[in-house]
């Protein structure tokens, strides 16, 4: 299943002087307007639910990754548990109370509240000292005619003091989707609001699409396969297991359109070499026109500063039908330069050069990139791999 997460970042309340969580929560509950929106970003992942829990991958990746969720999350909050953990805990371990019956569009719905004390909780929240169990409570709504759950809310107790947040509140909307002639109940939209100790907030809105079920004989790849041993006597300069040497300059064109209405970090991008890639002896390693494969690893909008910020990582170049691993940054690495083309854009020094992610800024109300031209230089792949998915 694919999840698309839009994360909105709201400024701290200007009139909030008491930074105690109780006062912040009380002020929020009495407030009748949303805080000022500072910016947003968008992230897209593939998610699979296996026996051990949820696993994730970038869109189009050949295998799922057992890495911690924060590897994919970047700088913003990202939650998991939408596919059963919260609901199972609420129904199996919760102290449940019936609240009321309500009519909506002529149909009855039943509303319940529940409490999960700490000793029954499976809700984990990451702190400076590792993961901590958190008690939580909430409500759920049942459709008695369809025998389905319609909505689940999850509200944590006050979070530990060694975290920047006071509380996290999730709202999960459920619906049925058809898989192999069966209508399966799944969450189709989730909203996660995090309230921080400085009174700022974030709101994650997650939409789930492309749900499918793996057959019993499907093989879930959770780790990269071992590279095959080199054949005896082989002196091939470049193989799929060998990356390009550092220091090679080249011009590239990203051909995948990047549109602010739909693009997200995690999306694959395709491009071509605009110039040949040559080694120090001036031999052509990859010709002009060779396909490039990469990925958007950052897509964010800063509203007050009025710009879009995108991060692109080139991952491989295709030579003779073989994909060669590639790690590169825009050149020059530590200088701001103009983006080729009519749009006002800047190539800026990367936040972390070892991540292998090139950073671009565009000052536009809407971003409609049909292509993106820039100069690059290869870097040591080992350095980029150390922060491979950040």
Predicted regions and their residues:
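Contiguous beta-sheet cores, especially beta-hairpins with glycine/small-residue-rich turns
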Residues: 150-152, 175, 239-390
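Structured extracytoplasmic
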Residues: 1-137, 144-150, 155-185, 189-246, ...
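Long, contiguous hydrophobic alpha-helical segments, chiefly transmembrane helices and signal peptides
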Residues: 136-142, 188-190, 206, 269-271, ...
């Amino acid at each position: 299943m694919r999840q698309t997460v839009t994360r909105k970042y709201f400024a701290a309340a200007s009139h909030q002087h008491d930074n105690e969580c109780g006062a912040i929560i009380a002020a929020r509950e009495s407030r009748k307007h949303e805080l000022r929106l500072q910016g947003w970003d968008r992230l897209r992942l593939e998610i699979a639910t296996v026996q051990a829990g949820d696993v994730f991958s970038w869109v189009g990746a050949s295998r799922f990754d057992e890495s911690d969720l924060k590897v994919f999350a970047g700088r913003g909050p990202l939650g998991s548990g939408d596919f059963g953990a919260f609901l199972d805990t609420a129904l199996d371990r919760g102290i449940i109370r019936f609240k009321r019956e309500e009519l909506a569009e002529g149909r009855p719905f039943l509303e319940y509240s529940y409490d999960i004390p700490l000793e029954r909780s499976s809700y984990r929240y990451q702190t400076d000292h590792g993961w901590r169990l958190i008690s939580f409570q909430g409500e759920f709504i049942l459709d008695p005619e369809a025998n389905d759950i319609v909505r689940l809310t999850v509200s944590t107790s006050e979070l530990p003091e060694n975290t920047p947040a006071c509380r996290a509140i999730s709202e999960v909307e459920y619906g049925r989707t058809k898989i192999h002639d069966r209508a399966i109940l799944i969450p189709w939209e989730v909203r996660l609001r995090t309230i921080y100790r400085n009174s700022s907030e974030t709101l994650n809105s997650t939409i789930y699409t492309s749900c499918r079920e793996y057959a019993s004989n499907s093989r879930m790849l959770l780790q990269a396969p071992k590279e095959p041993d080199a054949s005896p006597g082989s002196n091939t300069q470049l193989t799929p297991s060998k990356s390009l040497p550092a220091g090679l300059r080249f011009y590239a064109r990203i051909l995948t359109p990047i549109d602010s209405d739909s693009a997200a970090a995690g999306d694959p991008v395709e491009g071509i070499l605009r110039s040949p890639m040559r080694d120090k002896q001036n031999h052509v390693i990859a010709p002009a026109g060779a396909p490039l494969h990469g990925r958007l690893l950052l897509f964010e909008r800063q509203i007050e500063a009025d710009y879009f910020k995108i991060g692109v990582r080139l991952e491989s170049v295709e030579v003779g039908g073989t994909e060669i691993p590639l790690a590169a940054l825009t050149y020059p690495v530590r200088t701001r330069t103009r983006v080729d083309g009519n749009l006002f854009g800047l190539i800026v020094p990367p936040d972390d050069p070892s991540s292998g992610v090139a950073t671009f800024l565009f000052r536009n109300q809407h971003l409609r990139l049909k292509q993106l031209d820039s100069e690059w230089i290869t870097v040591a792949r080992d350095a980029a791999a150390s922060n491979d998915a950040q």
